Amino acid sequence: MRNYYKQKKTKIMKMKYFIPLILLFFTSCATIVRQVLPLENLPIPTGEYNVGTKIFTWKDSSRMEWFGEESNKYRRIPVQVWFPMEGGTKQLNSPYLQYPKDYIRVISTDFNIPGSLLLNIENIRTSATIDGNPKTRLGKRPIIIFSHGLGGFKNQNTIQMEELASHGYIIFACDHVYDAGFVRFSGDEIVYSKSFVRHFPKGTSEEEYWDTREKHLLIRSQDISFIIDQIEKLDTIDPALSLLCDSQNISLMGHSFGGSTVLSTLLREKSINSCIALDAWTLPMPSNEINQNINTSFLHLGQLSDKYWENKNNRLKLDTLVQNNKKQSIRIRVPQTKHFDYSDFSYFTWATKLFGITGKINRNEFRLSLNKILVDYFNYTALNKGEFSIERVKQLYGEIEVIRD
């Protein structure tokens, strides 16, 4: 295995032991934790529409599950959809997480953070109305499909999902099962991630590791293609929602491993309108994909520094892919941001900065700028509305590095 994986593991281990020592005093009292480490509700979306959300579990009868104990079952895909809704409200009245106790258990285990520090997660609220009625009189609206990162969740970028939906977009996001932090299907059936480096057998060679990651990438990409197929037959699944969905106007968006997932999908799904990658992990993409033409309008937003990846090939692969793209590619590198600034994780509490999980950038200002960039870009590429100029981007972000190809 490459040295940068050993280095990353060492850094994570240091953080695992450092955090509990600093906060040991607070773990004994939930009341103190809630006061010292409050977690904020999601911000109210700025668009004109109230937002509804629905959750489905779809079965792909064309594919068997890819992990051993499930290899005799068809792959199941949990999907959440955000959309403009009829009526409703922008009040914070819905829970952010379906299963907060499971979420606390996963985060506590993965980062060795005392669960008592995460108690406030179950109190986080969002303005999206669960099982709201789609605003069908809007007619067909553009679709965005989102792919989460390694160990992430379908709702890890809910702030962006709600913002886009409030501006008239329909957003589908799935849990990549066995890659998502956890998936609860029903009752006591919980499927945890088996995709981290620690899940690989001891003695796994570098070649074996990347062969597995390429297979992993393909399965994730097939998940996205399956969602596209399901959208085509949505009138038999949810007739009201189908009236809003323009299946001929689909864009993709992904964070981290989700970034390479949507980029890989572009090579199989030729009708995609545009694509946004948030701090993409491109290392799993094989050379034969990197050297192809994605032929799609593409925007990448990410960190200015390469320290997180500890491997210059992540940037080099992105550069190569961009150079081979025959359509417009724009890369935005934002100073003082880190990997998890491009998800909801950075918004909930200042403590993420204290432990170096997120960057020094002002989280509220960055959220507003990021949301504005996403809305402006999709308006430009999916609706032919407005403009997406480098000058406007610089006004929003200030000191950034912008590369346009």
Predicted features, each with a name:
Residues 127-141, 146-184, 306-311:
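Short substrate-entry loop that stabilizes the transition state in hydrolases
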Residues 273-339:
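The feature captures the conserved acid-bearing segment of alpha/beta-hydrolase catalytic domains
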Residues 227-292:
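Primarily recognizes the serine-hydrolase "nucleophile elbow" in alpha/beta-hydrolase
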Residues 33-143, 363, 374:
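Domain-level recognition of soluble alpha/beta enzyme cores
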Residues 34-45, 52, 61, 68-69, ...:
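Alpha/beta-hydrolase-fold serine-hydrolase catalytic core, especially in secreted/extracellular enzymes
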